[in-house]
Amino acid sequence: MKKIIFLLIFLLIISCKKQTPKNYDVGYIETPIGEMYFWLYEETPLHKDSFIELANLSYWDSLSFNRVIENFVIQGGCPDTSEGFSNSPYLIKPEFNPNIKHIYGAVGMGRDDNPEKLSAGCQFYIVHDTSGISRLDQNYTIFGQVFKGFNVLDKIATLQTDSTDTPLNRVSLKVRTLKMSKEELKALGGDSFLKNIDEVY
């Protein structure tokens, strides 16, 4: 009788585990122009964890997209100056992956010119070039990929800027991370990316 009870309990536990939906880590950026959603890759755990930690601390909420170059990138976080990189809370070892490239909407970590190619924990960029930027591959770490909000990316990338590529009208940031199920991802129009997500996670 005890064996039967244990067997039933075991089957119940297995059944509950099977019914638990899988959630995925998603980055979220809110700006005055609109919202963007992007995957956070498991293949770059140091950068992913860093992004999640700073987002949960609301680190970027007082900062902005301070460097905007059409057909290149939009960049935000710590100021795009040597002092800005010096003020980064920490640096991150590179996590290059030959299968993750600088395509349109790729999200990467910025850095200054250092031989180890260490990333500045506070600064990130999003690729705007629809043809991709292959020269950045294996030089800058990508940790995410936009799947919703490309229209927002385009609008920010085409804003009027000054001689330092700073937007004339400040683009403030509110950065968070979300947990989403497949159903929630589909509701946001991410259907075409679900197969890739299953391969990644």
Functional labels for PLM-detected ranges:
Residues I4-I13:
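Sec-dependent N-terminal signal peptides
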Residues C16-Y201:
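Cyclophilin-like peptidyl-prolyl cis-trans isomerases
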